[in-house]
């Protein structure tokens, strides 16, 4: 944010009038702009503000790409946009520029709250969007914030109410909607979904639906991805009815060109599963002067391959990245890999979407991706912005035919490569030696084996993935294991639930267990009993046992307790002849039958529940009509439609009531939290002055600086405020002043009011003497 200069009232008035006139002229240009006639090639040809143009120029963004040329004018005019383009085509700027321009033309300030919400499926992509926004928007006065998992929630809560443009992942955004008191989305202008097809799939379905329910329906929505979804259900969830498609034909149409960049050289090799690690190690050894990304299917495999290859020392720097790492480690790895020239990165699909790595030479897919969309996003890490790149995928003989057929539907036909036997090197003996010496490596190998087999088991495309054809023993030997570990396979329902829980915030899962007042009820889990606890809980079985002591104690106090609980008065005697005779079973068989519910029902029949009408006649709870009575009411299809429509109206009415009740509960929770915060602030104000922290505006610094400030705040927030201590040694000047005040007090003479002349004379004499 540029430094503000002080102006007098007249100057400020002129500046406001000038800015208002600029905004009016800009809106006129946007309405009159026709992309078919203008055919803009540069950003300066578009109807955008001077501040945005200045930021784009300083960030070296000058020429427009095809997706930017087609989508930005439509977004500036307020249309909902469904955009798709090849990887590395500049989709990030295609939605960031309309976000800045929309808020600029609306004269958005800090007091207006949240104006734009940008949702990304991964933390790394959200961080990249935040960095680009900081570069191109540093000459504007909007405040931007980044909320992702792995960061201090308290630090984000304190500042989220003053953010104009919020970028984050679905789980953390929903967590702030439930917990942050000042987070208000009622004034939202734009919703942006980057990698929209991933955000709309099953993994984020419930989270995204909950977010959208809290957003106003009058917002503008922008969807961007390299593989776009045109499902009517997905678009209806986002309230998209009248939207504009941009660039989707070349990506989704089967008769169009390939969905991958033209400068990307794609190839594949047929490799048996037990030989994959040998081929991978040999490939890395022969490409030591390259920048490589190696994709594997699970984090366990990434960890195992990284640790084993690191000990084998192929001669190139090795890095690994997966979703189970802490956020600081993931950020450092991304930064190092981006700056390195010759390096190999082992990764899962956590960086398969949207991440812009400079100058990647090779993208290697050791494991077959789950679908063609994942393949397109993986290979899209190379050949970005027209640069050259290469990709290689390893397919087993069982996967080759089916997956190549899937690729052909998108006009992707990779060329087949043959392996030179002279370049191939087996590392199985070295792996067996490493796993024999290091038990931790052996454990990682077992986990990698299990995770790969489970990943094949849960795949939906059974034409490509054949679980029953996996050579388990040979694959285990290729990892250096002495044998194939035993694996327990769960049902598909539990697998889908695990996928859903994987993308759900732990804080949200905790809040789901809260009661109506918002208090989280902690489960009383049994504590772990150690052998020392068991030792102290042992009881004596000899003369020192509890039973023996009770007996001896009772005998010792027999005399004292002689009159305790004695009958003092008898009302009457009970006559056994007057008691009613109960039906007592006469034999064991009758007793067993009386206690058996099944036998009782067999003899007496099932109980029937009836209801009585106004006339007192009994009717069964569920009365079924005869076929003749049913046909008298009309056609069966018509009755079915009437019943469904009636039930649909009832459910819609109940759904509105349920949503209103849920909304009132959320508001009540927020109100209580706000009241608690207000009381806490009032208590703090009595002890010390309140120090407000400034908002982090665009362009205030690097992303790393903003994140470091968040970490510092986290440490500071944990420290308690210490009361101000008095100085151990008093100042000498203070002592002198105290002595002077004491002397003056001693000189004061207290007398009664004089009544006579003699009293006045004595008072005068005393004053003269003193």
UniProtKB/Swiss-Prot annotation:
| Boundaries of every Helicase ATP-binding domain copy | 72-246
What processes does the entry annotate via GO biological process terms?
rRNA processing
GO CC term, one of those recorded: nucleolus
One GO MF term? ATP binding
Per UniProt, subcellular location reads as: Nucleus, Nucleolus
Looking up InterPro entries in the UniProt record yields:
DEAD/DEAH_box_helicase_dom, Helicase_ATP-bd, Helicase_C-like, P-loop_NTPase, RNA-helicase_DEAD-box_CS, RNA_helicase_DEAD_Q_motif, SPB4-like_CTE
Segments carrying motif Q motif: 41-69
Query: Is the keyword Transport in the record?
Result: no
Q: Which residues lie within the region annotated Disordered?
A: 596-615, 650-770
UniProt keyword RNA-binding present = yes
Binding residues for ATP: 85-92
Q: Which CDD domains match?
A: DEADc_DDX10 (cd17941), SF2_C_DEAD (cd18787)
Q: Which UniProt keywords apply?
A: ATP-binding, Helicase, Hydrolase, Nucleotide-binding, Nucleus, Ribosome biogenesis, RNA-binding, rRNA processing
Motif DEAD box per UniProt: ranges: 194-197
Q: Where is the composition biased (Basic and acidic residues)?
A: 650-667
Q: Where is the composition biased (Polar residues)?
A: 701-711
Catalytic activity, EC: 3.6.4.13
Domain text: The Q motif is unique to and characteristic of the DEAD box family of RNA helicases and controls ATP binding and hydrolysis.
How does this protein assemble? Interacts with the U3 and U14 snoRNAs. Associates with pre-ribosomal complexes.
Q: What does this protein do?
A: ATP-dependent RNA helicase required for ribosome biogenesis. Involved in the release of U14 snoRNA in pre-ribosomal complexes. Required for pre-rRNA cleavage at site A2.
* The name this protein goes by in its record: ATP-dependent RNA helicase DBP4
What gene is it encoded by? DBP4
């Amino acid at each position: 944010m540029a430094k503000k200069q002080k102006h007098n009232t007249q100057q400020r008035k002129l500046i406001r009038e000038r800015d208002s006139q600029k905004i009016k002229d800009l809106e006129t240009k946007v309405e009159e702009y026709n992309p078919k006639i203008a055919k803009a090639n540069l950003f300066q040809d578009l109807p955008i503000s001077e501040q945005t143009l200045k930021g784009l120029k300083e960030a070296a963004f000058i020429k427009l790409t095809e997706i930017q040329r087609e989508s930005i004018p439509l977004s500036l005019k307020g249309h909902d946009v469904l955009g798709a383009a090849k990887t590395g085509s500049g989709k990030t700027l295609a939605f960031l520029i309309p976000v800045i321009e929309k808020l600029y033309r609306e004269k958005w300030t800090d007091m207006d709250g949240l104006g734009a919400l940008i949702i990304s499926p991964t933390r790394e992509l959200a961080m990249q969007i935040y960095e680009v926004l900081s570069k191109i928007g540093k000459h504007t006065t909007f405040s931007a914030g980044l909320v992702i998992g792995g960061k201090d929630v308290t630090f984000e809560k304190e500042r989220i109410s003053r953010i104009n443009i919020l970028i984050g992942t679905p789980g953390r955004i929903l967590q702030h909607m439930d917990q942050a008191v000042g987070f208000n989305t009622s004034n939202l202008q734009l919703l942006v979904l980057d990698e929209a097809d991933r955000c709309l799939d099953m993994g984020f379905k419930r989270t995204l639906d909950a977010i959208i329910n809290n957003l106003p329906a009058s917002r503008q929505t922008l969807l961007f991805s390299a593989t776009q979804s045109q499902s009517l259900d997905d678009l209806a969830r986002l309230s998209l009815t009248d939207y504009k498609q941009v660039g989707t034909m070349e990506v989704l149409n089967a008769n169009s060109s390939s969905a991958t960049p033209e400068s990307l050289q794609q190839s594949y090799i047929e490799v048996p599963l037990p030989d994959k690690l040998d081929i991978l190690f040999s490939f890395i050894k022969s490409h030591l002067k390259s920048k490589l990304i190696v994709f594997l299917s699970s984090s366990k495999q990434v960890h195992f391959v990284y640790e084993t290859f690191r000990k084998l020392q192929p001669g190139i720097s090795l890095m690994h990245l997966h979703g189970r790492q802490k956020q600081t480690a993931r950020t450092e790895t991304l930064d190092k890999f981006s700056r390195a020239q010759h390096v190999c990165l082992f990764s899962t699909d956590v960086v398969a979407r949207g991440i812009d790595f400079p100058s990647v030479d090779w993208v290697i897919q050791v494991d077959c991706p789950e679908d063609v969309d994942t393949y397109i996003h993986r290979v899209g890490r190379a050949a970005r912005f027209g640069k050259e790149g290469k990709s290689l995928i390893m397919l087993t003989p069982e996967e080759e035919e089916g997956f190549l057929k899937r690729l052909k539907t998108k006009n992707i036909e990779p060329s087949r490569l043959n392996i030179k036997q002279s370049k191939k090197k087996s590392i199985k003996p070295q792996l067996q030696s490493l796993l024999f010496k290091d038990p931790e490596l052996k454990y990682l190998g077992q986990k990698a084996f299990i995770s790969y087999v489970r990943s094949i088991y849960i795949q939906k495309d059974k034409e490509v993935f054949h679980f029953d054809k996996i050579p388990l023993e040979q694959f285990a030997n290729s990892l250096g294991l002495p044998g194939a570990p035993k694996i327990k396979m769960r049902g598909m329902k539990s697998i889908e639930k695990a996928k859903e829980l994987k993308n759900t915030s732990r804080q949200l899962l905790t809040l789901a267990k809260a009661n109506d007042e918002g208090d989280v009820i902690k489960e009383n889990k049994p504590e772990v009993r150690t052998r020392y606890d068991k030792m102290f809980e042992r009881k004596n079985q000899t003369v020192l046992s509890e039973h023996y002591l009770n007996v001896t104690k009772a005998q010792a106090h027999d005399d004292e307790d002689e009159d305790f609980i004695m009958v003092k008065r008898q009302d009457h005697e009970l006559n056994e002849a007057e008691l009613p005779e109960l039906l007592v079973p006469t034999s064991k068989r009758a007793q067993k039958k009386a206690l058996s519910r099944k036998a009782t029902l067999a003899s007496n029949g099932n109980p029937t529940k009836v209801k009585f009408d106004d006339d007192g006649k009994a009717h069964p709870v569920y009365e079924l009509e005869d076929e003749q009575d049913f046909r008298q009411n009309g056609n069966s299809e018509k009755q079915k439609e009437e019943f469904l429509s009636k039930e649909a109206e009832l459910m819609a009415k109940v759904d509105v009531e349920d949503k209103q009740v849920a909304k009132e509960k959320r508001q009540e929770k927020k109100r209580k939290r706000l009241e608690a915060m207000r009381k806490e602030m009032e208590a703090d104000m009595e002890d010390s002055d309140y120090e407000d922290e400034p908002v982090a505006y665009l362009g205030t610094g690097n992303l790393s600086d903003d994140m470091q400030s968040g970490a510092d705040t986290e440490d500071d927030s944990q420290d308690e405020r210490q009361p101000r201590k008095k100085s151990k040694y008093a100042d000498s000047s203070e002592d002198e002043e105290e002595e002077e005040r004491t002397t003056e007090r001693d000189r004061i003479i207290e007398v009664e009011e004089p009544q006579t002349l003699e009293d006045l004379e004595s008072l005068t004499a005393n004053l003269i003497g003193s």
